[in-house]
Amino acid sequence: MSEMTLNAAEQPIDELVGWVKQHDFSLNLTTERLAFLIAIAVLSNERFDEELGEGELHDAFAIVTRLFDETGEASAFRANNAINEMVKQRLISRFVSEITDGASIYRLSPLAIGITDYYVRHREFSKLRLSIQLSMVADEMAKAIEAAQKGGTPGHWKKNVYGILKYSVGEIFDQIDLNQRVMDEQQQSVKQQIADLLNKDWREAINNCEALLSETSSTLRELQDTLQAASDELQTQILDIQEIVYGDPELEFIEEALFGLQMKLDRITSWGQQAIDLWIGYDRHVHKFIRTAIDMDKNRAFSSRLRQSVKDYFDSPWYLTYADAERLSDLRDEALVLRDDEVTGQVPMEVEYEEFQQVNDELAERIGDMLKAHKDQGAPIDLSVVLRDYLAQHPHTHHFDLARIVVDQAVRLGYSESDYQAVQPDWKAINEFGAKVQANVIDRY
């Protein structure tokens, strides 16, 4: 919020309304009138003194009228009416010069400059512009700190410190804030472009959407990095001046100015991170929409468009890109049961020098007991039970390698009928650390 807005906000609303009514302020800019005002601004920027004669305004009006041919011809009468409307609305100021034999000259008013700046000068919020503005702020703050360290009379503080903080640093902060609002509008424009792409051409929409999303994300990230790097230095400079004026009642107006700058700096910095967070959320939303619409295609909209594209191929040729991934092998096939190779892996230190036959005999004894129970009671052999009992006797760090040995021996001793029926087994825990095994019970041996 600028200083002018702050001063206006402190006044009662009825006084402000009376002031507007007293001066008969009003704005009525049609598209044609706005284009005329922008044309005047462009021509003014090309002039050293930014002054235009009446003939130049007529030329600008003729250029605009050619593009708005439905409104009528570019007559001198219509041009004068348009100029008089601009003067009445305090958008341009008219001066009569004796040097030019009474001919009028025109200049843009501050209101017109503010309007045209929005449409002409602030359409691009770049990292370079932001860096320059932040550099200017740092230089002005350095001047204010130097003046504050020297000290002096209240007049010295008013001129050399307060004046810089309020009219130099504060206005640059307001300009950065305005540029950030322009960036907000650019984001809305990108969102509209993405929406139009998704509604118009599905085949081209995905790549274009990705480019727009990536470009905007990169821009926001660069701007935020620039803001973050500069804000730390500015924060330090504000604190340095606050430390100098702290406790001095005669310099309370300096503290108030610093407080206002602190609020503006916080708002500028927080805007960058908030803009990134909001854009990340929108980015995810768009990607989720694309995945849902294309992968799921519940309403068959994409399918119908594809069929139509195939039908219109000879009128509008296109290329088809497809992916042919390798098939996944089923590990529970006949080869797994009948294979005779050993599972390799690092052997734990405790069993590195242990005879493999000893490990095999121990496993065979356990499985033999279970086979006997299976023979006597018809109970299947559950590999998860064998693994859980055996691994419980060894350290956690050895479980993986030992489990491989157990599985290797188990598949040699028997197999499961369910493997041949393509039955998917459940995952079962084999230790207390989250390890699980997925294997059908052995019921054939």
Curated annotation (Swiss-Prot):
GO terms for biological process: cell division; chromosome condensation; chromosome segregation; DNA replication. Gene3D superfamilies: Chromosome partition protein MukF, middle domain, MukF, C-terminal domain, Winged helix-like DNA-binding domain superfamily/Winged helix DNA-binding domain. Residues 213-241 are annotated as: Leucine-zipper. One of its GO terms (molecular function) is calcium ion binding. It holds the Pfam family MukF_C. It is found in: Cytoplasm, Nucleoid. CDD domains: MukF_C (cd16337), MukF_N (cd16335). One of its GO terms (cellular component) is cytoplasm. It comes from the Bacteria. Keywords: Calcium, Cell cycle, Cell division, Chromosome partition, Cytoplasm, DNA condensation. Belongs to the MukF family. Interacts, and probably forms a ternary complex, with MukE and MukB via its C-terminal region. The complex formation is stimulated by calcium or magnesium. It is required for an interaction between MukE and MukB. Involved in chromosome condensation, segregation and cell cycle progression. May participate in facilitating chromosome segregation by condensation DNA from both sides of a centrally located replisome during cell division. Not required for mini-F plasmid partitioning. Probably acts via its interaction with MukB and MukE. Overexpression results in anucleate cells. It has a calcium binding activity. This is Chromosome partition protein MukF. It comes from Vibrio campbellii (strain ATCC BAA-1116).
